């Protein structure tokens, strides 16, 4: 008999029902569970798939460059970045007739186009690209890298080129390679690009392959580097009247510490960023030489961990046993990587708007809103994934004998204290925050707004003042003209910082009040509850008082039958599933807050946010309802406008989201009966009954239906908010 899907599990391939298909898809990437898997093949498969991932990323970015060069208006946009709308690509087949064609023909295009809200135009402009030819060359180069990556993936699956398990487990070499080779060298290379191409480009000088060996990035060349007079590279920076992309007001400095923003572009100084990347390169190049490999010098990570026994015996045997535990568990390593990447992605969201790195991006409000929201949602999914793999580690890879009385074992030993403290924090935050909001709602409803409970966030205001914000009148540290830090800051480091933090036209340290205090605590509630669910899922993954043998049931199980009542919904997977809803909920509050505060800032009526954000009705009426009106008007009796595509996506997002509940609220029995009835009807319908199936149709398992429901809920939720965000922002600011 021919091999049926899935080839990696012969047991599943012989399943006579449609379960074969869904379980096959669900376990396709769970390499550990496949037939005939060895540790060696497991590592090699994952290694090869990384190359495939890189190939897809390079192909995707190549496509961005190619479509903008082919169908965009990059060269026109470069002439006037503030008033020309950047085009992402053409719309091939605009439906709905002539009104649609007219509505979507913009940005100086000849036909219907999509506007880019990704910030790529600002990014490419900042790093020195100026023409469509530049974009095409970039696209071809990335296409080449994509092909090389695919070749690399194929090569490392060939017997001669397969790395051994010992190579994969050589932690010191990998750390050195990634720290020095990946971060260090690439940061140094990026500094080189900024100094040799981007900074001259910002001063109106085009440096390309044909002249980059002739153009000195700095008048004195490498002289100051070799004579130790490095400060010469910081002298004569661009002036505050510098026009970006021209020589007017330009200086000659290449590595500076100016601080603040370029007055015209409202983005960080390119020379500051070059300096930053050089410093990062220096640090990482050193860090990549710290671990012992073939040369017998440097640290052994195992020795470091073994030696690290905290004083007083309070953490038992400290980090003994951790090296082998982590180095032999791919799930532990993936959990650590995802936790780090999740935090970094969220930090990217926070810093992209407050410290914009790309020229003119701060004035493109829709792009700012889209990038913030995008990075926060990505961060949420990555962070929940970190806990999922942490839980799988405890179920599949954790060895109690190997970790006796070390920090990992002690986490499990006092998990009740950890979980109950998190529970207490969540309850406290939830009841108090909701109590304040509801009290204020009632006061507004009764016509006595002066009886609201409004709490000034004085500690946060004090922290902002310490960083130099003067409007609160705290007169402390950098906001005090008498402090040594203030005086040093004027000359030695970041003289532009204090101007930037007290300037009202950027998003640096926004002024905060009672509305911010409340929403901050609502977000804290969401973060703590999400963390509670995830931490409990991981710490109880091996077993709990209710179900001591839980680890024998694996990561995801629906229940342990009727004989052990109450074992439903307690698998580690169920914790992940619940946590994703809370994660989405929390990021909803975060993005609502960010967006509403910024809309009022950009429109110059911050009082609307300040007055309406202290009670729930204010959020519902003055943020959600007020800003969705343009969206709902995408189609109206007078035809359609350029927001109509977002109006459609808003409706479609709600549809997908609502479909999620069909899977989340009805379970297997209902679907099984429905499927059997439909199959009966099919088999008795002429013509239709000519179509037969080999697999007996059965309903999804409870766990699978939950996954499908969760996927629809998440995708619909994000689609709906994306349409709302882009339409309400672009509708106001063009």
Swiss-Prot record:
Is Mitochondrion given among the entry's keywords? Answer: no
Q: Which Pfam families match?
A: PsaA_PsaB
Residues holding [4Fe-4S] cluster: 559, 568
Co-factor remark: P700 is a chlorophyll a/chlorophyll a' dimer, A0 is one or more chlorophyll a, A1 is one or both phylloquinones and FX is a shared 4Fe-4S iron-sulfur center.
Parts of the chain that traverse the membrane: 46-69, 135-158, 175-199, 273-291, 330-353, 369-395, 417-439, 517-535, 575-596, 643-665, 707-727
Which InterPro entries does the record match to this protein?
PSI_PsaA/B, PSI_PsaA/B_CS, PSI_PsaA/B_sf, PSI_PsaB
Q: What's an example Gene Ontology biological process for this entry?
A: photosynthesis
Summarize where chlorophyll a B1 binds, as residue positions. 654
Major localization listed first in the record, in broad terms:
plastid
Membrane topology according to the record:
Multi-pass membrane protein
- The EC number(s) attached to this protein equal 1.97.1.12
User: Into which family does the record put it?
Assistant: Belongs to the PsaA/PsaB family.
| HAMAP family hit by this protein | PSI_PsaB
Which function does this protein serve? Answer: PsaA and PsaB bind P700, the primary electron donor of photosystem I (PSI), as well as the electron acceptors A0, A1 and FX. PSI is a plastocyanin-ferredoxin oxidoreductase, converting photonic excitation into a charge separation, which transfers an electron from the donor P700 chlorophyll pair to the spectroscopically characterized acceptors A0, A1, FX, FA and FB in turn. Oxidized P700 is reduced on the lumenal side of the thylakoid membrane by plastocyanin.
Q: What is this protein called?
A: Photosystem I P700 chlorophyll a apoprotein A2
Gene that encodes the chain: psaB
């Amino acid at each position: 008999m021919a091999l049926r899907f899935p080839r990696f599990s012969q047991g599943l391939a012989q399943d006579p029902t449609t379960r074969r298909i869904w379980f096959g898809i669900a376990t396709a990437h769970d390499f550990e569970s496949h037939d005939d898997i060895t540790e060696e093949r497991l590592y090699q498969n994952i290694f090869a798939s990384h190359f495939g991932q890189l190939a897809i990323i390079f192909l995707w970015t190549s496509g961005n460059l190619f479509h903008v060069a082919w169908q965009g208006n990059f060269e026109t946009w470069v002439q006037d970045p503030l008033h020309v709308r950047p085009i992402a690509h053409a719309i091939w087949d605009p439906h709905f007739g002539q009104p649609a064609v007219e509505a979507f023909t913009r940005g100086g295009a000849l036909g219907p186009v999509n506007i880019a809200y990704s910030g790529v135009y600002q990014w490419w402009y900042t790093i020195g690209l100026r023409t469509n030819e530049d974009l095409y060359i970039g696209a071809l180069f990335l296409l080449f890298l994509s092909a090389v990556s695919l070749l690399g993936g194929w090569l490392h699956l060939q017997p001669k080129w397969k790395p051994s398990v010992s190579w994969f487990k050589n932690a010191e070499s990998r750390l050195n390679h990634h720290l020095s080779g990946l971060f260090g060298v690439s940061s140094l290379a990026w500094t080189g690009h900024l100094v040799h191409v981007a900074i001259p480009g910002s001063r109106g000088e085009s440096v390309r392959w044909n002249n980059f060996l002739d153009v000195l990035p700095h008048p004195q060349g490498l002289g100051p580097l070799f004579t130790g007079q490095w400060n010469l590279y910081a002298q004569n920076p661009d002036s505050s009247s510098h026009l970006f992309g021209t020589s007017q007001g330009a200086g000659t400095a290449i590595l500076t510490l100016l601080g603040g923003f370029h007055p015209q572009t409202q983005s960080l100084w390119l020379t500051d960023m070059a300096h930053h990347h050089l410093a990062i390169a220096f640090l990482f190049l050193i860090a990549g030489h710290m671990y012992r490999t073939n040369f017998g010098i440097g640290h052994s990570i195992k020795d470091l961990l073994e030696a690290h026994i905290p004083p007083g015996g309070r953490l038992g045997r400290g980090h003994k046993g951790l090296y082998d535990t982590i180095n032999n568990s791919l799930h532990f390593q993936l959990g650590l990587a995802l936790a780090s990447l999740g935090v970094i992605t969220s930090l990217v969201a926070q810093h992209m708007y407050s410290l914009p790195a790309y020229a003119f991006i701060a004035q493109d409000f829709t792009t700012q809103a889209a990038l913030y929201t995008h990075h926060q949602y990505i961060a949420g999914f990555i962070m929940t994934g970190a806990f999922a793999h942490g839980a799988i580690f405890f179920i599949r890879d954790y060895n109690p004998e190997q970790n006796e009385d070390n920090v990992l074992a002690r986490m499990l030993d006092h998990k009740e204290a950890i979980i109950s403290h998190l529970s207490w924090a969540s309850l406290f935050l939830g009841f108090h925050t909701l109590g304040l909001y509801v009290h204020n709602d009632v006061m507004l409803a009764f016509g006595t707004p002066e009886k609201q409970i409004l709490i000034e966030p004085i500690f946060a205001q004090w922290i902002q003042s310490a960083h130099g914000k003067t409007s609160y009148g705290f007169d402390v540290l950098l906001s005090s003209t008498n402090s040594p830090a203030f005086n040093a800051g004027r000359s030695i480091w970041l003289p532009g910082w204090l101007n930037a933090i007290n300037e009202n036209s950027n998003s640096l340290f926004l002024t905060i009040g009672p509305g911010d205090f409340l929403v901050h605590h609502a977000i804290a509630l969401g973060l703590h509850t999400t963390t509670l669910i995830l931490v409990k899922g991981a710490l109880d993954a091996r077993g709990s008082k209710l179900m001591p043998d839980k680890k024998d049931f694996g990561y995801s199980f629906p229940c342990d039958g009727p004989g052990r009542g109450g074992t439903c919904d307690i698998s580690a997977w169920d914790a992940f599933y619940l946590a994703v809803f809370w994660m989405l909920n929390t990021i909803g509050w975060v993005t609502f807050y960010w967006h509403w505060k910024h809309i009022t800032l950009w429109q110059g009526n911050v009082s609307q946010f300040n007055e309406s954000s202290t009670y729930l009705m204010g959020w519902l009426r003055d943020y959600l309802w007020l800003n969705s009106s343009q969206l709902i008007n995408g189609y109206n009796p007078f035809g359609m406008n350029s927001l109509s595509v977002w109006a459609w996506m808003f409706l479609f997002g709600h549809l997908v989201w609502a479909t999620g509940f069909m899977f989340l609220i009805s379970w297997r029995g209902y679907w099984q009966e429905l499927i059997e009835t439909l199959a009966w009807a099919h088999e008795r319908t002429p013509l239709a009954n000519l179509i037969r199936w080999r697999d007996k149709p059965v309903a999804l398992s409870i766990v699978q239906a939950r996954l499908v429901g969760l996927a629809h809920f998440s995708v619909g939720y994000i689609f709906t908010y994306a349409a709302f965000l882009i339409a309400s922002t672009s509708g106001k600011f063009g």
